[in-house]
């Protein structure tokens, strides 16, 4: 888990600065009416962080694997990230990810193998690793070719 949290902290530090350097116009521009702007992609990553944080916490103590799923388009629309200030969404994303690092670093190793239902059953260790892959995939949508990652 240390590898995951180290990598996540490095990504958050680097991309807080890189994303902050994107102009407000570019950050808010929608490629198509039905596609997310870079701002909304970062909002989606914030929603992902919120839902995964819940998985990492509830997954430790629930007797049965908790089912924690979410409808990503609804979350992005409900949060209305497109109307948020650029600095606010970046800071929210940054803080949520640092909280994930803190929770994962505090998690006893014997709980890494506990499962959570994300639509299918996965261990908390797997979810943590997948979270970073998912993050990289979407950061590539904000700053092209930042990572060599294939995420399906």
Which residues does each predicted region cover?
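Alpha-helical bundle segments that constitute or directly flank the non-heme di-iron/ferroxidase center
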Residues: 1-24, 47-58, 133
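Amphipathic, non-membrane alpha-helical segments in soluble helical-bundle scaffolds
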Residues: 1-9, 35-42, 86-90, 125-128
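Short leucine-rich amphipathic alpha-helices used at interfaces
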Residues: 4-5, 12-13, 89, 139-140, ...
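Acidic/histidine-rich alpha-helical segments that form the ligand environment
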Residues: 7, 11, 18, 76-112
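N-terminal start-of-chain detector that recognizes signal peptides
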Residues: 13-15, 29, 62-64, 99-101
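A short secondary-structure junction motif
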Residues: 15-18, 22-25, 63, 107-110, ...
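Short, contiguous alpha-helical
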Residues: 28-72, 114-152
């Amino acid at each position: 888990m240390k590898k995951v949290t180290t990598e996540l902290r490095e990504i958050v530090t680097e991309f807080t600065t890189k994303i902050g350097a994107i102009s407000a116009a570019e950050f808010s521009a929608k490629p198509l009416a039905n596609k997310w702007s870079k701002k909304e992609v970062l909002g989606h990553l914030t929603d992902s962080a919120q839902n995964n944080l819940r998985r990492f916490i509830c997954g430790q103590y629930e007797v049965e694997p908790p089912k924690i799923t979410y409808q990503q388009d609804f979350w992005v629309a409900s949060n209305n990230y497109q109307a948020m200030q650029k600095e606010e969404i970046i800071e929210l994303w940054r803080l949520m990810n640092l909280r994930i690092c803190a929770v994962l670093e505090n998690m006893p190793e014997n709980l890494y193998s506990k499962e959570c239902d994300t639509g299918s059953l996965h261990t908390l260790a797997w979810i943590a690793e997948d979270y970073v892959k998912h993050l990289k995939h979407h950061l590539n949508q904000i700053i092209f070719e930042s990572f060599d990652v294939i995420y399906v």
